[in-house]
Amino acid sequence: MTTKIERRIKIKYRVRNKVSGTAARPRMSVFRSNKQIYVQIIDDLSGKTLAAASSLGMTEKLPKKEVAAKVGEIIAKKAQEAGITTVVFDRNGYLYHGRVKEVADAARNGGLKF
């Protein structure tokens, strides 16, 4: 019997074999912990992070979904400053639901195309 974490890691590796980011269309990777949410835009060919945002520095207390939406807005703004308009969305083995969905929707509303 596999745990939730083992299941997520299996899905993550299965998806990562298919999804790769380039300089023209980098990969937007989401990591979700119990308290925080982190988003990176990565060029896999050069192995560099082009933009990153997280909920670590946020001081105001908000529900987790609202925090995720703010992080999505921040990453969209940073991506546009770096000249990135289209990305490949990597949900990192998480279900496209809840905080992961909020990040994606906020990034789309901020101007990123998936």
Curated annotation (Swiss-Prot):
GO molecular function, one term: 5S rRNA binding
Gene Ontology cellular-component terms listed: cytosolic large ribosomal subunit
Top-rank taxon: Bacteria
The protein's name: Large ribosomal subunit protein uL18
One of the Pfam families matching this protein, by short name: Ribosomal_L18p
Key words, A-Z: Ribonucleoprotein, Ribosomal protein, RNA-binding, rRNA-binding
Similarity field: Belongs to the universal ribosomal protein uL18 family.
Function: This is one of the proteins that bind and probably mediate the attachment of the 5S RNA into the large ribosomal subunit, where it forms part of the central protuberance.
Complexes and interactors: Part of the 50S ribosomal subunit; part of the 5S rRNA/L5/L18/L25 subcomplex. Contacts the 5S and 23S rRNAs.
Transmembrane segments: none
GO biological process: translation
CDD domains: Ribosomal_L18_L5e
